[in-house]
Amino acid sequence: MTEETTAIVQAGPTSIWLSENGFEHQALEADHSGVELIKVEADFLIPLATALYAYGFNYLQCQGAYDLGPGKELVSFYHLVKVTDNVDSPVEVRLKVFLPRDNPRVASVYWIWKAADWQERESYDMFGIIYEGHPHLKRILMPEDWVGWPLRKDYVSPEFYELQDAY
């Protein structure tokens, strides 16, 4: 018989603020540098992201994605920063949205942070995550006729791909 242990995660200040204001989320353990991590369901991303923008997280430093492994979920993440005048150590938080690999869809945050434009396109191009409402969602790195999502861990690389002449 094995014992399961559940680690109690200390909610950070942003998570506490979200809870006080009625936003559904789950606090995750902070990363190695102390950045607060928050798990958000795809349906609640836009209301929560809009609230965080109003709360002062005015800079999307990075948006990206990763694959948890074959048959497992894909993750779309958003690293937000509160940029204010004369601050040496701005407040940072990272949102994570876990998506099913068979239909990875989440609303685009482009309309909140314009910096998401090319970053969401790259996540689409490499992992196949559909960012609903994105104005230009198309491949950005791979050729338009490329089949599959190259950074997924279950991706099988084609044996041959013929480059087309530019002329």
From Swiss-Prot:
PROSITE patterns: COMPLEX1_30K. GO terms for biological process: photosynthesis, light reaction. Transmembrane segments: none annotated. It catalyses: a plastoquinone + NADH + (n+1) H(+)(in) = a plastoquinol + NAD(+) + n H(+)(out); a plastoquinone + NADPH + (n+1) H(+)(in) = a plastoquinol + NADP(+) + n H(+)(out). Its EC number is 7.1.1.-. HAMAP family: NDH1_NuoC. Belongs to the complex I 30 kDa subunit family. NDH-1 shuttles electrons from an unknown electron donor, via FMN and iron-sulfur (Fe-S) centers, to quinones in the respiratory and/or the photosynthetic chain. The immediate electron acceptor for the enzyme in this species is believed to be plastoquinone. Couples the redox reaction to proton translocation, and thus conserves the redox energy in a proton gradient. Cyanobacterial NDH-1 also plays a role in inorganic carbon-concentration. This is NAD(P)H-quinone oxidoreductase subunit J.
